[in-house]
Amino acid sequence: MKKLLSHSIEGTNHDNEDIYNVYKNYVWVMDGAIDLFDTPSKYGFSVSQVMQTLNKVLPKECKDYRGLKDILASAISQVQAAYLSSDLTYDYSESPTFAFMFGRFIGDIFEYIYLGDCYLICSQVYIITDSSFSPFVQANREEISQLKALQVPNLEFEVKEVYKRTRHLANKPSGYHIGSLDPECAYLSNQGYFPYSGQELMFMTDGFYNMFSVFGSVSEILSELQNLHLDGSVKLDDATVVVVRGD
C-alpha cells in the first residue's frame, strides 16, 4: 500500500484527539470525542493520551490471519488495562469514546470496519460512513436551538448537559454504537468489503469531511484550514485525512 497524503490539524482546543496510521496493508483514522466529563480530573488521563496509546498499540495487533474486529478488540483491551483498574466498574460512556474507520488490503479485496462519523471515500464518489448517529446529532441541534430561543440562563452549562445525555446513550440499547474503552465495542462495528481495482481511497474524520463536502478538494481544504487557524475567529474541530492506493 502506498500513502499518497496524510495530514492531521488540531482544532481550537489545541489537543488533537484524532489519530491515523498507514501500517503495511492496514490503514485507519479515528476521532476521539470531546471530553464532557473532565476525564483528567476523574481518571488522571486525557482523551488525547488514550487515542495516542491506541495508535501505538494497534500496529502490533495487525495480523492478516485475524479478523479486523478481533484486532481492534485486542488493542482496546491493552489500552483499557493501561488506563483503567480491573478492580472497578466503569460507565464507558464517561471515559473516552471515539469514531473509527479501520481497513486493510487482503489480495485484491479491501475490507473495513467502522463506527461513528469517520469516512471512507472511494474514487472521490462512493462514500462509506455510519449514519446511525445522525438522528442524535439532529436531536441535539434542535434541543440546543430551543435553548437559545428561550434565552435560558447559563446556556453553556445547559448545552453541555444536552451533549452529556446523548453521550450516556453510547452503546446502550436505546442509543448508538461507538468506539470506547470496552473491547466489546469492536464487535458492534459495521463491516464491509469491495474488490479493489487501483482507485484512490480517502479516509477522513468528520472535521475534514465537513469541509470536503463543501470544497471537494483536499488541497483547497488544507489551505482553508491553515487560513482559518491563522484567523483564529472560527471554532474548529480536529481534521484528519489519509489518502492511499493499493500496490
How does the language model describe each region?
Residues M1-D247:
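PP2C/PPM-type serine/threonine phosphatase catalytic domain
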